[in-house]
């Protein structure tokens, strides 16, 4: 299990106190403390709450996963985050238009995969891979929450989702599980493959891209958004993965380092068709009222991925690290005398 990270403000400090058994969630009052919904403090607090449903943390009681007071606290963090996301996206219920927009690749893009393919340095590639490990070492897990929420009798959507997930989990071969292939790439780059090793240095935009998956996946209410977010990944990943293969080759790294991205160039090109023709179409055939939620899932994840891309490229273009430097001093939690 990963170790608990350092706090990034009063809210995350308070959640860490709860997880460490130093106080009860029922004692927390967040009034006036939830400020920037995209900031480090709220995003880490949410990440901590969500991680209890995955691997949790060393020394944290398993019973806290379903502690009603901690779940209520999480809900008070989710509200401002989701409201802020929805305020920044166009909305609507035209799924076809949202998907078609994903299929348009710019001739001259500016995101991190473009940067790394053209001029990226080895240290920047390492940072990218390290930061993305927060998702890729549990790749496909957030989307697995939606499986029991899809119709299994008229199972077109469920069958297509399971086909893709089956591939993500190695199609029965442990060494081909995508999280395992990602860890192999990290090892080839000399990075720490421990689950959660880079949480302390992951800035808020990284946490937000993972948190939105967990938020949508853990709420049946947002099953349509979870499917939309999953569609975004499968439709848009092949071109970016191809550029990352180019970046690895340009840097003179051995072919095995690029295997993860090479796998996604091929596999996700097939997955794109499954997602469009069966998963999305099958879901909306049974539950057409979820169209707006599917669009939200696509738009929300696009927004947060763009925020992350802006952060990475801005830092790298300025000759700076994109990693976050943890605070030297402990943060005062909500409700403490120093808060």
Task: Annotate each language-model stretch with its function.
Residues 1-335:
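Non-heme di-metal
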């Amino acid at each position: 299990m990963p170790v608990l990270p350092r706090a990034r403000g009063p809210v995350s400090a308070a959640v860490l106190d709860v997880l460490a058994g130093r106080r009860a969630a029922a004692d927390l009052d967040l009034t006036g403390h939830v400020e920037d919904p995209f900031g480090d403090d709220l995003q880490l607090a949410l990440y901590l709450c969500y991680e209890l449903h995955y691997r949790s943390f060393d020394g944290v009681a398993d019973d806290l996963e379903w502690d009603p007071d901690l779940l209520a606290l999480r809900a008070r963090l989710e509200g401002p985050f989701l409201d802020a996301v929805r305020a920044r996206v166009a909305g609507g219920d035209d799924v076809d238009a949202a998907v078609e927009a994903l299929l348009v690749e710019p001739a001259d893009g500016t995101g991190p995969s473009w940067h790394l393919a053209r001029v990226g340095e080895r240290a920047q590639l390492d940072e990218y891979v390290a930061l993305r490990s927060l998702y890729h070492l549990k790749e496909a897990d957030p989307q697995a929450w939606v499986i029991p929420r899809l119709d299994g009798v008229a199972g077109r959507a469920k069958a297509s989702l399971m086909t893709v997930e089956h591939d993500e989990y190695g199609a029965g071969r442990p060494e081909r599980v995508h999280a395992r292939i990602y860890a192999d790439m990290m090892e080839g780059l000399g990075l720490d493959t421990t689950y959660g090793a880079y949480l302390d240095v992951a800035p808020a935009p990284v946490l937000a891209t993972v948190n939105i998956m967990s938020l949508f996946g853990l709420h049946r209410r947002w099953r349509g958004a979870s499917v939309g977010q999953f569609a975004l990944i499968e439709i848009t990943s092949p071109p970016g993965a191809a550029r990352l293969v180019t970046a690895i080759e340009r840097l003179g790294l051995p072919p095995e380092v690029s295997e993860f991205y090479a796998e996604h160039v091929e596999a996700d090109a097939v997955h794109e068709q499954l997602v469009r023709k069966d998963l999305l179409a099958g879901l909306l055939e049974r539950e057409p009222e979820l169209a707006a939620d599917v669009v939200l899932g696509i738009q929300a994840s696009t927004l947060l991925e763009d925020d992350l891309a802006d952060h990475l490229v801005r830092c790298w273009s300025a000759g700076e690290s994109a990693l976050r430097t943890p605070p030297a001093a402990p943060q005062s939690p909500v409700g403490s005398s120093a808060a």
